[in-house]
Amino acid sequence: MPSSVSWGILLLAGLCCLVPVSLAEDPQGDAAQKTDTSHHDQDHPTFNKITPNLAEFAFSLYRQLAHQSNSTNIFFSPVSIATAFAMLSLGTKADTHDEILEGLNFNLTEIPEAQIHEGFQELLRTLNQPDSQLQLTTGNGLFLSEGLKLVDKFLEDVKKLYHSEAFTVNFGDTEEAKKQINDYVEKGTQGKIVDLVKELDRDTVFALVNYIFFKGKWERPFEVKDTEEEDFHVDQVTTVKVPMMKRLGMFNIQHCKKLSSWVLLMKYLGNATAIFFLPDEGKLQHLENELTHDIITKFLENEDRRSASLHLPKLSITGTYDLKSVLGQLGITKVFSNGADLSGVTEEAPLKLSKAVHKAVLTIDEKGTEAAGAMFLEAIPMSIPPEVKFNKPFVFLMIEQNTKSPLFMGKVVNPTQK
């Protein structure tokens, strides 16, 4: 074995499919046996201690991605990235270890490391609880080079705390190794993410894969027949045509002066909520800089509804990121360098993190209302409702309600940009 080898870690967020679907489409065939898990917040408060950190990490990472380019869509899973790196930190020491946890927004003088990992353990357990109306699954996979001897404690901890599976791979056969990893991801995301790994270094001895898959249906769906082509203003000079979903009804929507934005909360059947932020003219950067965990918490606690005429674009976007540069801006650098200390993973050879790849896919549409037999009637006040059109760049979050954790975050600059 060479004296210096690379460790490829692959981070993946699977499909965020904001799509109403019929329960008959449940691929597991066990929808009737699933149960609601709304009580978990009281039973397992451990994850409450890490949720604010995950939210602030999400906003920090988002701002870095937005800073890199203001003309492209953004979509990523904060939970997926944080889970993978927190799991990796179990095998790191000294500065390498501290940089990772501090980069994930944890202050080690305020929260013991054991509570961080216990928080992730409870978070993953709660996210993977069956729900009759929502498909949400996460997975962690360790792909180990044949003959590589891991430190027993590291292997025990990642299995116990992060519910990780371990697989043996011949990284010398790069094509077969790629296929094994990509097949694992494709299966976990129900075919929505394929060929995640494009290239694999022959010196790779260890790969870590995390995925998250979400599929839900709106609590109050849109009618397909009401969707029409409308203009979306990418910037002051660029306009594109997009299919715009429309509905007149009662919404949890308000105009927030602090954010200079309209804020719309839309629930899914089950325990998830999407939050859309439509900034006032010229206020997108202001919105991006002002988002905090406390503000999001206040919006989630607000149940006030008002009438509005809502226009929301259908879209399908993909976010693919090499996280090395963006995480470097958050202070996570040592693990990618020759000075990395990953001796808690294996003592056989010095390791460093060679690659961190993250991919996420998003679809928003109104399909499935007829298949689900959905019909919803509501009374609308006689006063003229405001017309809120998401026809210019906007920001959104997907929150799991039990844990208040940020499953996904993104920005739509151009809905036609794949």
Swiss-Prot record:
Consequence the record notes for mutating residue 92 to I: In QO-Lisbon; deficient AAT with very low serum levels
Say if the entry is tagged with keyword Glycoprotein: yes
| Domain topic, free-text comment | The reactive center loop (RCL) extends out from the body of the protein and directs binding to the target protease. The protease cleaves the serpin at the reactive site within the RCL, establishing a covalent linkage between the carboxyl group of the serpin reactive site and the serine hydroxyl of the protease. The resulting inactive serpin-protease complex is highly stable.
**Name of encoding gene:** SERPINA1
Organism classification = Eukaryota, Metazoa, Chordata, Craniata, Vertebrata
Region RCL: start-end pairs:
368-392
Q: Which residues does the record list as Phosphoserine (modified residue)?
A: 38, 383
- Chain positions with S-cysteinyl cysteine modification: 256
**Protein name, entry field:** Alpha-1-antitrypsin
Q: What else is known?
A: The aberrant form is found in the plasma of chronic smokers, and persists after smoking is ceased. It can still be found ten years after smoking has ceased.
Q: What is the effect of changing residue 387 to K?
A: In Christchurch
Could you state what the record's PTM comment says about this protein? N-glycosylated. Differential glycosylation produces a number of isoforms. N-linked glycan at Asn-107 is alternatively di-antennary, tri-antennary or tetra-antennary. The glycan at Asn-70 is di-antennary with trace amounts of tri-antennary. Glycan at Asn-271 is exclusively di-antennary. Structure of glycans at Asn-70 and Asn-271 is Hex5HexNAc4. The structure of the antennae is Neu5Ac(alpha1-6)Gal(beta1-4)GlcNAc attached to the core structure Man(alpha1-6)[Man(alpha1-3)]Man(beta1-4)GlcNAc(beta1-4)GlcNAc. Some antennae are fucosylated, which forms a Lewis-X determinant.
**Which SUPFAM superfamilies does the record match to this protein?**
Serpins
Is this entry keyworded Secreted?
yes
What span is annotated as the signal peptide, if there is one? Answer: 1-24
Any single GO CC term annotated in Swiss-Prot or TrEMBL for this entry = platelet alpha granule lumen
User: Listed GO molecular functions?
Assistant: identical protein binding; protease binding; serine-type endopeptidase inhibitor activity
Top-rank taxon of the source lineage equals Eukaryota
